[in-house]
Amino acid sequence: MKKWIAAISAAVLAVTGMASAIPAATVTAADSKYNYGEALQKSMFFYEVQQSGKKPDWNEVSWRSDCMTNDYVTGGWFDAGDHLKFTLTNAYSAALLGWGLLNYGDGVEKAGQRTMYENNLQFALDYLVGCDQGDNIVYMIGDGSFDHVWWGSAEVYMDKYELMKGETERPYYTCEDSCIQADMAAALCTGYLNFKDSKPEKAKEYLEHAIDLFDRADKLRAIGDDAAEQPYYKITTFYDDLFYAANWLYMATGEQKYLDLCKTDYIPNLGKEEQSSEMKYTWGMCWDDVMQGGVLLYAINTGESQWKDQFTKHLEYWTTGYGGKQITYTPDGLPWLFQWGSLRHATTTAFLAYVAVDQLYQDDTAKAEKYTKFADNVMNYCFGDNSKNFSYVVGMGDDYPQAWHHRTSSGAWNDKWSNIGQTEGEDAKPHAHILYGALVGGPDQKDSYSDKIGDYQYTEVAIDYNAGYTAALCAMVEKYGGTSDPDFPPTETPKWDEFFMKASVNQSASSYTELKVFAMNHSAWPARTIKNLSYNYYFDISELVDAGYSINDVSVKIGYDQHSSDKGKISISDPIQYSGNIYYVKLSFADGSVVMPTGQSEHRSECQFRISIPDNIQGVWDPTNDYSYAGLEQGGEDAMVATDHITMYDGDTLIWGVEPDGTKPDPAVTTTTTTTTEQTTTTTTRATMTTTSNEIIYESAGALLLDDEPEKLTYRVGEDLDLTGLRISLKYYHGKDSCDVIYDKVSPADYPDKFTIDTSEFDSSKSGTYTIRVKASSDLILNYRLSFAEVSFKVTVEDHESTTETSPVTTTTTTASGQPTPSGAVLYGDTNLDGRVDITDAVLLNKSVAGAVVLEGDAKQNADCDGSNEIDSNDAVVLLRFLVHIINSLPSAE
């Protein structure tokens, strides 16, 4: 998402470029080594990737599917690498695409792209029609507080959204706004002009909406109440939009009144140069400033020389300078306006230059050549005419960006993205898909470029970034030719296993085998879930039969099901004969869509089950001949490996693994390769750290912490609850080296919109022990990815008179035998000796550090989480980092 949300002084930027000049040497586009037809074809592909709603039949992106079909207005383009929809950028982008097709449709057709181009343009325009509600507009769809803290694919977005928010429809926002409505009108006018002959009814609909939208925008003449989009797009002007749209209405209707409005009402209110009364000619056309596009259209529509001269100032500023002002040029010759979307600005100006050459400077050879060379240089810079021979268009050329900032194309299944596109580092991996045709933000003013997904100043992609670039390509294919690639897009083969099984042996004894299994969903071709999901575990009872027993002596039972309390609850079948003495049990999800590629806890489903015979049958149970047991190791999660001997099914269709008779999945259904995880031996490992590679993952996460319990913990019957002294903190850990303190030892009562104090259990009318809970709000849970969003403490109500307040109790934690002596079996982090490591251990350790609790024996040994042989605050920090998945093992000195 672009971070530019306020107007920047164009004059200041202009002055910084005074020492530069447009390069004297240029590459003639007619002799270019670049195929502009292919570039246009791939830009259409990018816009198809951005489609929301039901996927059209003509969409060629094989790894995209239906998504967000419950949006209040379906369809439209996702704005950038996220999944928000802004009417402003949809309209701005569609208008430029429509303008490019209108002026250079013959070239688009010769390049073999007219049908696809029209399909993409109509897709966006139909969305704008849907956003026109008559008395207002839908200006934004999506929840930014969720969207920008989750990284995953559009197809499973709503699965995660429903899980986190409990809603099946995204929020939408309405307003009346002169800027947005004028841009909508402009876009719809281009639709009318492009389709009036081929699709007259559709064109009529576009024009009717354009006229009405413009009339309402003109009557309002104000920026609307668009608060929801302001963190992303802060509109600063609207007269430029009215000016721009009025010119399009004139072109669509031929009615003079629109040009009259320009002259009398809009032009006097257009932008001026800094500290000057001169009409603005610096800066560039973009989503918040369409003035120069309006000036160009007005010059064309009126034929008045003063407006031709006015637009010439703009192109002079972008080339050799005008009035002492000139844009900055990079050492390689890129006109560089601004750090956000530098190529977006340059290519949009290139398009305006092409239009001006063809419609303003037909009789001025010098200017036509100058501005054509300028535009050619800009576009060819994008394709590799720079000192690095680097293409800034994904999928064009031999060397292009690898770490573009885009969620769906990444194919991330676990909400981890910081090293996507890298070859080294934790969780480094390529994008699942190549985002063909996307123009990235671009280099800085020294031609430097950081190809990292987190450096989105450089690597951002967006519909408005591609808009002027695409329109300029229309001009280039008409001027210089170009052909479509008949083999594009290429057929994609999954780069990793999409659905697969992992397993290890929990326990194995003389009468049973207990397995831990994970059903995995890493799908990205496209990302999806399977409702009717099941898997089979095969075992051989030959040793039982030889001893005179039968399958009737075998029992099966689930011991743990991650989804036991939700819609995915797993059931296990009685043993089913496969062949001879080989049987299997089928574990079936009530609803397999709970296994989804949306996060660390959802991309896998854990189940532990036991296959056993009666304990009194001795010496005949042997799992080593079991088909599915082969290759498994004992050790719980540490020993988990991917195994193709546990088969997975979508209904009756085999999608993973090899059955005992050699049956494999149909390659047409799924393409997979077996992967395994290298075993990592640690004293304590966290329960959610799994990968199918040999890498350790460090996750950003937060936690709510209880710093101080209230001063009063014991009450007499009838006394009111008093929470004086209650203090909590909220900390956010990212990477493995840093922590942000969001709230530090605050009273939750002071932040009622952020924390809820749940006292519903407390009953002062009768004696008892009651739990008081403090819970974080849903926005805190989302924004800081809280692994622990609740803390609690207990208070006691006594039925007799108490003469003194209860003092803090100092306690000693001992072993189960009551003796505070080490047993030698250390489970680091398990301070309360319950055999598990969880948040209750962290609470107890914090109390120990504060001096309220004394840990001895095993508890003290387990508390030494940093391995320093001392119990201090660092142990508490290390344990918390383990619990929120920043580190994956204890003890740790990190």
Each predicted region: which residue ranges?
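Low-complexity, intrinsically disordered segments enriched in Ser/Thr together with acidic residues
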Residues: 585-619
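Aromatic (Trp/Tyr) and acidic
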Residues: 30-45, 49-100, 142-183, 187, ...
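Cellulosome-associated attachment modules in secreted, modular CAZymes
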Residues: 19-25, 696, 796-894
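Short beta-strand elements of extracellular/lumenal beta-sandwich folds
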Residues: 510-531, 537-539
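Terminal connector regions
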Residues: 606-667
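A surface/secretory-pathway sequence property marking extracellular, secreted
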Residues: 542-591
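Solvent-exposed, low-complexity, repeat-rich "mucin-like" stalks and linkers
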Residues: 700-739
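Serine/threonine-rich, repeat-prone extracellular segments and beta-strand-based repeat modules
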Residues: 736-782, 793
